[in-house]
A protein has these predicted regions:
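ATP-binding Walker
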Residues: 11
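P-loop (Walker A) phosphate-binding loop of NTP-binding proteins
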Residues: 8
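Small-molecule kinase domains that catalyze NTP-dependent phosphoryl transfer to phosphate-bearing small molecules
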Residues: 121-167
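Glycine-rich phosphate-binding loop used to anchor ATP phosphates in small-molecule kinases
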Residues: 54-103
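Conserved phosphate-donor/acceptor-positioning beta-strand/loop module used by diverse small-molecule
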Residues: 99-119
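Conserved substrate/cofactor phosphate-moiety recognition/catalytic segment
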Residues: 18-63
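Hydrophobic anchor at the beta1->P-loop junction of P-loop NTPases
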Residues: 5
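Walker A/P-loop
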Residues: 14
Length: 174
């Protein structure tokens, strides 16, 4: 089983993924962001974009990573990810669904104010020089995640991480 946790930066994807891993025996987390960091580090960018999701290599590697992790997991593969581009989302989700027709995609949601507050609390700079990219991305995610296109909506606004993880567990085990 593959469980994709979509949502904006700061909405709690990694925290929820860790809680799900502890609730799903044999599960592992595959975070495609790690590969994105590698691509940024080795500077494979072929455009002005600073978003590794713009790279076909990243999108195909995300699918390949899910496939490989699925071979070695003794439970679910949990994939925290921040999609707001429908084309990229469709490309990756369709390919993963071809590997695992039971793919579950959830989209964590919180207000822009809450997301900003959480990012600041964890030490992420969201205003001023050097923060333009993340400021733009959290707004893009907020706007894109207003409907269920990017996954089954899960409200995180007034809920603890444990409550959110429990809600996702309830949905995938019913």
């Amino acid at each position: 089983m593959v469980v994709m946790i979509n949502g904006s930066f700061g909405v709690g994807k990694t925290t929820i993924a860790r809680l799900l891993r502890s609730s799903l025996p044999g599960s592992i987390i595959f975070d495609p962001e790690w590969f994105g960091f590698i691509l940024n580090r080795i500077n494979l960018k072929r455009s002005e974009s600073w978003d590794y999701q713009d790279l076909v290599l990243w999108r195909r590697s995300t699918v390949a990573g899910v496939r490989l992790f699925s071979l070695f997991a003794h439970g679910a593969v949990i994939v925290p990810i921040a999609f707001s581009n429908r084309e990229y989302f469709d490309e990756v989700v369709t390919a993963i669904r071809n590997l695992d027709p039971g793919l579950r995609v959830f989209c964590l949601r919180a207000s822009l104010a809450t997301v900003k507050k959480r990012l600041v609390e964890r030490g992420t700079k969201i205003e001023g020089p050097g923060s333009e990219w993340i400021a733009r991305r959290i707004i893009e995610c907020e706007e894109a995640h207003g409907d269920a296109y990017f996954g089954e909506p899960v409200d995180t606004e007034n809920y603890s991480a444990r409550q959110v993880a429990d809600e996702i567990m309830r949905r995938i085990t019913k």
